[in-house]
Amino acid sequence: MSRVGKLPVAIPNGVTVTVTPDNVVTVKGPKGELVKAMSNKINIAVEDNSVVVTRDNDHKDVRALHGLTRALVNNMVTGVNEGYVKTLELIGVGYRAQLQGKKLVLSLGFSHPVEMEAVSGVEFEVEGGTKVKVKGIDKELVGAVAADIRKWRKPEPYKGKGIKYENEVIRRKEGKTGKK
C-alpha cells in the first residue's frame, strides 16, 4: 500500500469535492474552483468529509499513480482553501521589480526590462522592489510561473547575484586567489 495514497484527504468546512464517474475531480472553495482529470486506473470516492483514493491492483504504474493522485487531490483542496505563495528575492545591484497593472516588469541588468504577463489564476505582488510574491490556488501553476521568473537570472555561486527563492540556500564558491 502506498504510504501517501492510503491516507484520506480531509475536506475542511466551506470546501466541496465532487468526482464524476470518469474520474474528473472538481474542488470548490472560498478562493476558487479547480478541475482536474485523474487516471481511470485509480478509484476516487468522497466519504464522510474526506476523499479516499484506492487502487484495484498492484501493478507498478498503478502503485505510482496511487500516491500521485492522492497528493494532487490534497493540493487542490489546500489550494482552494488557503492558496499557495512562492516568494522570490532579487539580489544584485540594480535588480528591481515593479508592477504595471497585472504585468511584472523586472530590471535584471539586460539592455531592456523583462516583462511578464500574469497568467490567469496567478497574481503578482512586489514588496520593496526586491521581493516578488507569486500567488494562486493551483500549486503546479504557481511553481511553474515562479520558476519562469527565476530562469531569467539564476543565482550565481560567486557573489550570489540573481533571482532566488526565499528559503533557497545558494552554495557559494571561492573566487580566484590571484598571484602574490
From Swiss-Prot:
**Can you say what this protein is called?**
Large ribosomal subunit protein uL6
Q: Which UniProt keywords apply?
A: Ribonucleoprotein, Ribosomal protein, RNA-binding, rRNA-binding
- NCBIfam families for this protein: L6_bact
A Gene Ontology molecular-function term?
rRNA binding
Which residues fall in a coiled-coil region? none
Q: Which InterPro entries match?
A: Ribosomal_uL6-like (IPR000702), Ribosomal_uL6-like_a/b-dom_sf (IPR036789), Ribosomal_uL6_a/b-dom (IPR020040), Ribosomal_uL6_bac-type (IPR019906), Ribosomal_uL6_CS (IPR002358)
State any GO CC term.
cytosolic large ribosomal subunit
What Gene3D superfamilies is this protein classified in? Ribosomal protein L6, alpha-beta domain
Q: What HAMAP family has UniProt attached to this entry?
A: Ribosomal_uL6_B
Lineage, uppermost ranks: Bacteria, Bacillati, Bacillota, Clostridia, Eubacteriales
Q: Which PROSITE patterns does the record cross-reference, listed alphabetically?
A: RIBOSOMAL_L6_1
Q: Name one Pfam family in it.
A: Ribosomal_L6
The UniProt entry's sequence similarity note says:
Belongs to the universal ribosomal protein uL6 family.
Please cite one Gene Ontology biological process associated with this protein.
Answer: cytoplasmic translation
Quaternary structure and interacting proteins, as annotated: Part of the 50S ribosomal subunit.
Function noted in UniProt = This protein binds to the 23S rRNA, and is important in its secondary structure. It is located near the subunit interface in the base of the L7/L12 stalk, and near the tRNA binding site of the peptidyltransferase center.
